[in-house]
UniProtKB/Swiss-Prot annotation:
Residues 7-14 form the Transferrin-like domain. One of its GO terms (cellular component) is extracellular region. The lineage of its organism: Eukaryota, Metazoa, Chordata, Craniata, Vertebrata. This is Ovotransferrin. Keywords: Disulfide bond, Ion transport, Iron, Iron transport, Metal-binding, Secreted, Transport. It is found in: Secreted. Monomer. GO terms for molecular function: metal ion binding. Transferrins are iron binding transport proteins which can bind two Fe(3+) ions in association with the binding of an anion, usually bicarbonate. It is responsible for the transport of iron from sites of absorption and heme degradation to those of storage and utilization. Serum transferrin may also have a further role in stimulating cell proliferation. GO terms for biological process: iron ion transport.
Length: 14
C-alpha cells in the first residue's frame, strides 16, 4: 500500500 503522501500527490497530479 502506498503512503498517504503518495496518494495525496497522485490526487494533485490528477
Amino acid at each position: 500500500a502506498a503512503p498517504k503522501a503518495t496518494v495525496r500527490w497522485c490526487t494533485i497530479s490528477s
